[in-house]
Amino acid sequence: PCSELIIGMKCGGSDGLSGITANPTVGIFSDLLIAQDGTTILTEVPEMFGAETLLMNRCENEEIFEQTVCLINDFKEYFTSHHQTIYENPSPGNKKGGISTLEDKSLGCTQKSGSAPVRGCLLMERQ
């Protein structure tokens, strides 16, 4: 049954067309699976930087909203604590393929999550 499926969605290399082709298609799949009690997980938190509010606006409740904010902020803090720039995305390959800004890439990432409510947030543990 679909309720036993858990699908993780990862960036496979974005270009100028993925935001109008593959990513929306994956989002539709995500919505269909969730409608059948399946689960999808949007991975690669740094890929969300720049479009995270789209996910936050879909959080099912205040607790999940706060967890999502915490997840994003923890990743940003991790980057800055290691002297890494947060907004050094997209990659040269993304740019060559037609993506010019972080927001372009991030919008593509969040499209893969579809439009269903965000019902959970897996927080990362630091070691």
What are the residue ranges of the model-derived segments?
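Active-site cavity-forming subdomains of large catalytic enzyme subunits
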Residues: P1
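Anaerobic metallocofactor- and corrinoid-dependent redox/one-carbon enzyme cores
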Residues: E4, M9, D15-Q127
